[in-house]
């Protein structure tokens, strides 16, 4: 029978070979090192396997400053890395809880952002089987969908994140630490049952395990099965997406609502939001999106907030992801020859000289160009043989969504609307084919997710 240390080494080597078997050169791993028993054991195990697996190791410690002992934790991590001759980095961060996540969740979010920024080729964390069980239970209690219930993958390809201990119990890790004299710290906040995860770990799981001894393994297995279902849904959505998406995945063709069954539609919308790195909205909001589109008339302008910063809007047979703008900026600015002109809250303008294109500098004469926001009611005549039209009508003809029309900057000379960036130039001011003209491109930050 294998001893507990052998079990750890065997699991890590097996996991490594599954994900890095095609690697021709050394694998560059950065260990997320908190100073706790799990991460300190992970560092030691990878150090022992360094030669066998051809590893290049480094470690990073995130200093939250939330504990009076934080400096001590950092020093312990540094001392251990010096002892093992492993490159060590530490990063101090301030916790931003403006999103109302709570200190625990906000700290976790900030920690992962820094870890991924600082990590080399692959980030390695010491999450284990008990962590997975706790995560699944928390997601169940929140009423999460498949993505939440799948919990933590062993290897996250997109984020280059490896969790080699995920199939190992906390008990095995602690025994390894004891048998190998691993130095580690105890975070005093782990005893605080005001935090949901600690409450489950200290109050609920002991009772579950006493009644159902296989609780931890069973929950881990359930998370694996949910992950398989999630992967199947992703594969179906990827196939469906080929027929219903724009190239940049910013908008979704609403034809899906009449050609696909409801569950496939919801699945594709979830995939779309995930593809654009949006937090998954509640089932109530998903039902609202579906119901409003099904009932909507051709010209309906649907606007459903899926978070404090993003909304799903409908226009001209498409669903769009649109940033929520708190207020419209008003401006009246003079162009002084800049190649790039930053606009208040609505992107920037790029000015270029082009032969036979854009605004004629000769026809403009000494008049200055004024850059203004739209106020409504503007009229424009880009074609000599066409009547003057309202700008709204002309922009509707090119299917510009109303939220972009609201932000669109326009260019005046005296009282004449001479140019609309990304659309056209007043016919009387168009540059002749053999003359230098001024082209103006609008880059709309608000349309970028």
Feature locations, PLM:
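Proline-centered helix-kink/hinge sites
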Residues: 87, 164, 206, 213, ...
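Conserved anion/nucleotide-ligand pocket segment
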Residues: 203, 207-219
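Internal, active-site/partner-interface "lid" segment
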Residues: 190-197, 217-227
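PAPS/PAP-binding and catalytic site of the sulfotransferase fold
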Residues: 176, 200-208, 263-275
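AMP-forming adenylation/ATP pyrophosphatase catalytic core
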Residues: 2, 7-38, 58, 64, ...
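Core alpha/beta nucleotide-donor-binding catalytic domains of modification enzymes
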Residues: 2-206, 235
């Amino acid at each position: 029978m294998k001893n507990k240390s052998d079990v750890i080494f065997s699991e890590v080597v097996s996991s490594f070979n599954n994900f890095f078997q095609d690697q021709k050169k050394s694998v560059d791993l950065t260990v997320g090192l908190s100073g706790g028993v799990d991460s300190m054991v992970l560092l030691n195990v990878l150090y022992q396997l360094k030669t066998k697996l051809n590893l290049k190791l480094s470690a990073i410690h995130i200093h939250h400053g939330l504990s009076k002992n934080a400096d001590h934790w950092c020093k312990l991590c540094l001392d251990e890395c010096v002892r093992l001759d492993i490159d060590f980095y530490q990063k101090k961060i301030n916790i931003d809880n403006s999103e109302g996540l709570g200190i625990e969740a906000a700290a976790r979010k900030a920690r992962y952002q820094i870890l991924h920024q600082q990590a080399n080729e692959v980030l390695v964390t010491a999450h284990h089987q008990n962590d997975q069980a706790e995560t699944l239970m928390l997601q169940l209690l929140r009423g999460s969908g498949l993505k939440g219930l799948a919990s933590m993958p062993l290897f996250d390809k997109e984020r280059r994140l490896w969790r080699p201990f995920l199939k190992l119990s906390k008990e095995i890790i602690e025994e390894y630490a004891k048998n190998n004299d691993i130095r580690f710290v105890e975070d005093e906040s782990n005893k605080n049952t005001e935090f949901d995860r600690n409450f489950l770990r200290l109050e609920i799981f002991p009772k579950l395990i006493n009644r159902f001894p296989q609780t931890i393994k069973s929950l881990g297995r359930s998370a694996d099965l949910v992950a398989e279902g999630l992967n199947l849904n992703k594969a179906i959505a990827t196939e469906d997406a080929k027929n219903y998406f724009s190239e940049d995945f910013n908008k979704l063709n609403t034809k899906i609502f009449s050609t696909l069954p409801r569950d496939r539609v919801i699945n594709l919308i979830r995939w779309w939001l995930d593809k654009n790195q949006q937090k998954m909205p509640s089932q109530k909001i998903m039902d609202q999106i579906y119901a409003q589109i099904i009932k909507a008339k051709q010209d309906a302008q649907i606007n459903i907030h899926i978070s404090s910063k993003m909304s799903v809007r409908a226009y001209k047979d498409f669903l769009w992801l649109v940033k929520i703008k708190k207020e419209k900026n008003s401006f009246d600015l003079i162009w002084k020859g800049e190649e790039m002109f930053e606009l208040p809250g609505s992107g920037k303008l790029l000015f270029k000289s082009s032969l036979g294109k854009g605004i004629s500098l000769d026809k403009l004469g000494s008049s200055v160009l004024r850059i203004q926001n739209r106020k409504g009611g503007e009229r424009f005549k880009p074609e000599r043989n066409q009547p003057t039209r309202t700008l709204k009508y002309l922009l509707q003809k090119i299917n510009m969504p109303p939220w972009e029309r609201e932000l669109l900057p326009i260019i005046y000379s005296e009282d004449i609307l001479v140019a609309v960036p990304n659309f056209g130039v007043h016919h009387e001011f168009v540059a002749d084919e053999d003359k230098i003209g001024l082209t103006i491109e609008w880059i709309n930050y608000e349309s970028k997710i």
